[in-house]
Amino acid sequence: MSTEVSEAQARRAVADIFNSTLASSAIGAAWELGALDELRENGKLDVSDFAVRHDLHEPAVVGMFTALASVGIVRREGATVVVGPYFDEANHHRSLFHWLNQGSGELFRRMPQVLPNENRTGKFYQRDAGAISYACREISERYFDPAFWAAVDGLGYTPTTVADLGSGSGERLIQIARRFPGVRGLGVDIADGAIAMAEKEVAAKGFGDQISFVRGDARTIDQVSARGEFAEVDLLTCFMMGHDFWPRENCVQTLRKLRAAFPNVRRFLLGDATRTVGIPDRELPVFTLGFEFGHDMMGVYLPTLDEWDGVFEEGGWRCVKKHAIDSLSVSVVFELE
């Protein structure tokens, strides 16, 4: 197969790569600022009016929409922006772009400094925990929730106390509290910014007396001072952070610590994206490359689905069911007991 392209084709392709980089960041910004929701509801918006209503710098707002227009997400018709041919798909995946740019942008920006081995000591990279929590709330809702609720509906019992590891914004615990009146929730997160955000969310939605949070690392759960609360938990959940348990020996130890720390858990719902195998470079779906490359940069091992299957029994758990998620790379919710 010929790979030759004309000079004009190469020039256009490289310009598209450059513009797509800006558009990628603009998707996350347009979501956070409310533009994508307004376009979804109305099909169009007036740029000047939008800037005034949200107290935004109008020339920069024009630039944001120009970036989106350069890749077909919107079209600019004078002072009006209308949805483009790729709007629905981009809007559906908007939280993934926010995770990549607003949450992990600093990691990728410093790629030349992060890659050299001599620099990979101590805290050698930085991400925005608050932005990641903001994005992960919708990532969880759009991609993991159908599989999660299918697992919850099949529990065979009504949970009384739920603990969520890597609880982020606290949204999962809020949803569970809505589903099961009277249930108590406990979030465990390592990031102070995420806990502060979650506490505000929980209080604002009226669950401050049911849901609480503790700062802690799931990998060293035995060092978290919440033994009494942990002993009451009968449903344990963990989403989008199970890969932090790895490599294998560490994962087995973490699973054993969790089994000991939560002695009365009847089900452990563990959901995560896994490392893909065998996908050609030019056919990688959305999110996969950013997720895998980003974690490689951070030195975080990403297991394959088969590798996950090989640790549960040794870690003190039995996998009773797997709920596949086809819309987000190779992702899954494991039902463990």
From Swiss-Prot:
Top-rank taxon: Bacteria
EC number: 2.1.1.281
Biological-process GO terms, alphabetical: antibiotic biosynthetic process; methylation
Reaction catalysed by this enzyme: 3-phenylpyruvate + S-adenosyl-L-methionine = (3S)-2-oxo-3-phenylbutanoate + S-adenosyl-L-homocysteine + H(+)
Keyword field: Antibiotic biosynthesis, Methyltransferase, S-adenosyl-L-methionine, Transferase
Described function: S-adenosyl-L-methionine-dependent methyltransferase involved in synthesis of the nonproteinogenic amino acid (2S,3S)-beta-methyl-phenylalanine, a building block of the antibiotic mannopeptimycin.
The keyword Repressor is assigned to this record: no
Source species taxonomy: Bacteria, Bacillati, Actinomycetota, Actinomycetes, Kitasatosporales
Parts forming coiled coils: none
Membrane-spanning ranges: none
Name of protein: Phenylpyruvate C(3)-methyltransferase
Family note: Belongs to the methyltransferase superfamily.
GO molecular function: methyltransferase activity
Keyword Lipid biosynthesis on entry: no
UniProt cross-references to Pfam families, sorted A to Z: Methyltransf_25
Cross-referenced InterPro entries: Methyltransf_25, SAM-dependent_MTases_sf, WH-like_DNA-bd_sf, WH_DNA-bd_sf
